[in-house]
Each structure stands twice: as structure tokens, then as C-alpha cells.
UniProtKB/Swiss-Prot annotation:
UniProt keyword Cytoplasm present: yes
Top class in the EC scheme: ligase
Function of the protein: Catalyzes the attachment of proline to tRNA(Pro) in a two-step reaction: proline is first activated by ATP to form Pro-AMP and then transferred to the acceptor end of tRNA(Pro).
Any single Pfam family the record assigns to this protein: HGTP_anticodon
Cross-referenced PROSITE patterns: AA_TRNA_LIGASE_II
Subcellular location(s) of the protein: Cytoplasm
The name this protein goes by in its record: Proline--tRNA ligase
């Protein structure tokens, strides 16, 4: 396997192949095949997302994949932002369609004509829905599995509210949702507000969640958008107020994709392979029997006990592979916890355990299994977050002049907000502005022009 530190790009591609996450040999560029192990990880990520939004009164829907050109063109600024990325369906069978149909690049234009039918009065608000679907964008840059592709596994939440204040409260709730998700995936991040020229087409403002990979490049792993009434006015989404007058709904959206999996791979993996957070590991505990009297029966008993407390567990009973091969194989697949069982463990009623991200072995009593394993999985997750935060901090640097932008990582510096200064920074340092740091109230002189500025984040990005 490639060395992660010396050649991150090759290491990343190799680990996806070796761990059997995805197969990019499908004969349409940028549309990869999800393999069972990769799809199971993604499904577990989706489950975390669903739990986080379901308990906050979102409801799941599923909209058609095709959007008529006339529906897209209702919001001109929106379609202009995607016009170079849209796949168009122009024929049905042999007949040319009367109206071109787009494969959804995102779902505003599909959903909002329906919002205008569903929302009639203040009693219908707030409306909070989401879907997890494929979206399609004709990506012309170099494609990379889970990072830059043409068929994207996409979570999108859409809301409508009676007032701007209610919509702003929803934006705050999105941050709360993201904190919950990121804590389980062990992903550190920045909140930053994108500059106007980089916000989502049609939005009042966009806030992104950015992390940094060991290559020093940033990876956008989520965005939230405040639409105000920009879309509701164009799609005629209005409601009857209590005073008998009509007003337009205020809207927000939240988007994430399989880049979450890319971040997990890139941030947590090592030269042995994947390191998976326990909450998204298809197999949380792998049991390796060391051949001997009574070993397999003992291993099955341990497996049944862990199954009974909802631990995802598997006994590796393959006969033609050595224990050493199995150790390496499951390490490469990122299984958080390994249990070794030989004749000694059977005799002593013990278990030998190894954690994927913490060196060394421990011996635990069989009688304490149902307590020790869940506690150990929590310890693994906490250590993963600790390690990830260290890597994140090691790749964030403060700069007071352009000469200090030459490090591999995220740069924080004061910026006045002008496009001219942003362009100068990019031209001289190859780093572009991500946005103003949302959680920072610091002010100072712009690193380029010396005018008053706020703290911003800059990087090379995927």
C-alpha cells in the first residue's frame, strides 16, 4: 500500500480499491459502482443523518429524477449557476421531446412547484422535508471517487417558514444537526460564510462546513443556505396569514453528500488501511478464532452475546487463511475492534482484544463482555476524534502577510471581503478564499490592502 503521508492521492485511490468500497471501471466517466462494503458504510452514514433530522420533525420524501426545462428556468439565477453542469434528456424512445428534461442537479426546481400547492396557510408552516437520492452534474474537472463525480449520493433538506426569523432559527438548527453528525463521524471542521460570488445560486447567503485532508487541501463536506423569499416569489409559494393577508414563505436548505465518506477515509485512514468510526463500521467487532479445541464453539457464543446487544459482529471462519492474514485483512477494512480466541482464552474464560486505532492488546473476562465491548467502542471513537482534531490543528496556520500563505493547509487571515483582494491572494498563493469564519468575531487589517477586515479561511480545495 502507498504511504499516506508521502503520496496521499495514490494512497486514497488504492485504499478504495483494496477495501472494496467502489469500482470506478464502469464505462461512463464519473459514475462509479458502489460495492457492498462501501454501500453499507454509506447506508450507516445515511442512518445517522436520518436519525438526526427525523427527531427534529423533518419528513422524508422522494421526488422524480426528471425536471422540465420550464421548471428550472423559473429561477434564472439558479439555473444560470448550474447550466454548464446539467444532463439533458431530449428524446423519449425515438421521438424528440416537446420539452427538454434535466436530470436533477439539485431539487429546488422539482420541489418548489409542489410547495406552492401544499402550502396554503400559516397552519401549513413550517414545512420540513428531506430526501437522500442521486443527483447528476456534468463535472468537467478531474473526477475522484467520493469527492468529484458525476452521479452524487446526496442528502438535501428543504424547509419553508412563516418569517425570516423562523428561517434563521432553522439555520441554527442545521448547525446543531451537523455537530451531532460530525461527532459520530469524528470529523473536525470550520464554519465559514461563502463570499457572494461563491454562494449557492439563488441564496441570500451560504455557510459551508469545511474540513482539511492530510494533503493540506480543504474538503467541503456540507452546506446550508438561507434563501429568504428569493425562490418563493418565483415559484409563488405564499401562505394566508392570521390577519387575512398573504405573504411569501422564507426558505432554507441543507446539503451533504458522499464526501462524508471521503473525509472519513482521508482523515482517519493509515498505512494499514481504513480506520472506521464504530458508528459507521459495517462490522464493529471481528472475531478471529485461533484453531484449537473448543475455540469455534466459544467464538460463536461470544458472537451471539454481542448480537444480543446490537453490536455488528462477525466470526471469520474462513478455513484457507491464516490468523495473520485475517488480522491484516480486517485492519485494512477498518474494523474498530478485534477479538482473538484461542485455546488459552477458552480455558481461562477470557478474550484478547485489539483496537484498530490504539496499539497493544488487552485481556478481558468473558463475563464482562457486554460491558467492555460497548465501552471500548466509545473509547475508540473518542480517540479517533482526538487524533482527527490534532491533524486538523496541525494543518491550520495563521498568516499576517501573503508570504506566509505558502504552507500546505488552511490559512486564516484578515480579509476585507473584496473580490480584488481575493483574486490577488489566489494569483500569488494558489489559495482561494473559502469564506469568513462564522464563529470568529476578530477584526483586523486585510492581509492584502490593509483596510478593515474580518477573519477568513483560505486554502487549495478539492
Amino acid at each position: 500500500m502507498e504511504n499516506k503521508k508521502e503520496n496521499f492521492s495514490e494512497w486514497y485511490n488504492e485504499i478504495i480499491t483494496l477495501a472494496e468500497l467502489s469500482d470506478k471501471r464502469y464505462p461512463v466517466k464519473g459514475m462509479n459502482v458502489w460495492l457492498p462494503y462501501g454501500w453499507k458504510i454509506m447506508s450507516l452514514i445515511d442512518s445517522i443523518v436520518r436519525r438526526a433530522v427525523d427527531k427534529r420533525n423533518f419528513q422524508e420524501v422522494n421526488f422524480p429524477i426528471l425536471i422540465g426545462r420550464s421548471m428550472l428556468e423559473v429561477e434564472f439565477e439558479h439555473i444560470r449557476g448550474f447550466e454548464n453542469e446539467i444532463y439533458w434528456v431530449t428524446k423519449g424512445g425515438k421521438e424528440k421531446l416537446e420539452e427538454e428534461l434535466a436530470l436533477r442537479p439539485t431539487s429546488e426546481s422539482a420541489m418548489y412547484p409542489m410547495f406552492s400547492l401544499w402550502i396554503r396557510s400559516h397552519a401549513d408552516l413550517p414545512l420540513k422535508i428531506y430526501q437522500i437520492v442521486s443527483v447528476y452534474r456534468y463535472e468537467t474537472k478531474h473526477t475522484r471517487s467520493f469527492i468529484r463525480i458525476r452521479e452524487i449520493h446526496f442528502f438535501e433538506a428543504h424547509t419553508a417558514h412563516a418569517t425570516y426569523e423562523d428561517a434563521e432559527a432553522q439555520m441554527d438548527q442545521y448547525k446543531e444537526i451537523w455537530r451531532e453528525i460530525s461527532s459520530l463521524l469524528c470529523l473536525p471542521y470550520f464554519y465559514d460564510q461563502r463570499p457572494d460570488w461563491d454562494k449557492f445560486p439563488g441564496a441570500m447567503y451560504t455557510i459551508a462546513f469545511d474540513t482539511v485532508l492530510p494533503s493540506g487541501r480543504s474538503l467541503q463536506i456540507g452546506t446550508i443556505h438561507q434563501y429568504g423569499t428569493n425562490f418563493s416569489k418565483n415559484y409563488d409559494i405564499k401562505y394566508l396569514k392570521e390577519d387575512g393577508t398573504f405573504d411569501y414563505a422564507h426558505q432554507t436548505t441543507y446539503g451533504m453528500s458522499e464526501r462524508l465518506l471521503a473525509a472519513i477515509i482521508g482523515i482517519h485512514g493509515d498505512d494499514k488501511g481504513l480506520v472506521l468510526p464504530p458508528d459507521v463500521a459495517p462490522i464493529q467487532v471481528i472475531i478471529i478464532p485461533i484453531p484449537g479445541a473448543g475455540v469455534m464453539e466459544y467464538a460463536r457464543d461470544v458472537e451471539n452475546t454481542l448480537n444480543s446487544i446490537n453490536i455488528r459482529v462477525k466470526v471469520d471462519d474462513r478455513e484457507n487463511y491464516t490468523p495473520g492474514y485475517k488480522f491484516n485483512d480486517w485492519e485494512m477494512r477498518g474494523v474498530p475492534l478485534r477479538i482473538e480466541i484461542g485455546e488459552r482464552e477458552v480455558k481461562n474464560r477470557t478474550l484478547t482484544i485489539s483496537m484498530r486505532n490504539i496499539q497493544g492488546k488487552l485481556t478481558i473476562e468473558r463475563s464482562k463482555l457486554i460491558y467492555e465491548v460497548p465501552d471500548t467502542l466509545i473509547r475508540i471513537r473518542e480517540k479517533m476524534m482526538e487524533n482527527a482534531q490534532k491533524v486538523f490543528k496541525d494543518h491550520v496556520f495563521r498568516a499576517t502577510k501573503l508570504e506566509e500563505f505558502n504552507r500546505d493547509g488552511l490559512i486564516t487571515a484578515f480579509w476585507c471581503g473584496s473580490k480584488e483582494c481575493s483574486d490577488k491572494i489566489e494569483a500569488e498563493t494558489e489559495k482561494s478564499v473559502l469564506g469568513f469564519m462564522v464563529d470568529s468575531s476578530e477584526t483586523g487589517k486585510c492581509v492584502v490592502c490593509g483596510k478593515n477586515g474580518k477573519m477568513a479561511v483560505f486554502s487549495r480545495s478539492y
